[in-house]
């Protein structure tokens, strides 16, 4: 029984993960699908043909979404990794951590509406720079939370060892910590990029209709009441993250740091 338990759990988990994608795919190919049928009664490619006709605008939105997500991830991960070291070694680390996580205490829509007036006065509404600045506090707080687990007594011992051997502080960062934290930083980059890639509220409010991302395109189809077209667009939205996970499954969870073992 125990030998069958692990394969059974693995198959069940895989089926649960794959089920939403299968439903989306069937919905995107459905012409008619009524309750209580388990699959569409009639099929068609019309939804995908419509996406093909709209491909230039979708590709442009996907490219802008990707650039925005990469910028948010790079800034948030870099700042989060370097500042989490000072945070974990501070006597007030719990207060600093609470401050870094403060944006998560406010719903994104409320946060965006609170910033909208100030951003309008600064001329940031309707610009990608404004959306970037609005997304950064959330991504940075998450990066700090994720990276602080790297800074343990062992990492401090490595600091002292490298410095005692004549390494400069910059060399300790580049030759010791960055190589050891490479896996963790990859996870942090991927997950903070996803926060920007799937963001809707901040892009909608701060972007003020002038910032187009692929997520907004999906919600536009939903707003139009075309669930089949929205399902096809949602598969396009999920495609890049899924391809990244297939290429490197370790992006899904933080690795156990070698300095903490």
Which residues are covered by each model-predicted region?
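Glycine-rich helix-loop "coupling/hinge" segments at transmembrane-helix boundaries
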Residues: 36-41, 199-228, 261
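Luminal/periplasmic active-site loops of membrane-embedded glycosylation enzymes
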Residues: 39-51
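Membrane-water interface segments at the C-terminal ends of transmembrane alpha-helices
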Residues: 2-34, 49-152, 180, 184-200, ...
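Short alpha-helical segment that forms part of, or immediately flanks, the ligand-binding pocket
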Residues: 134, 159-160
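Short glycine/proline-centered loop/turn elements that form peptide/ligand docking sites
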Residues: 153-158, 257
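Short helix-to-coil transition segments within interhelical loops
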Residues: 160-181
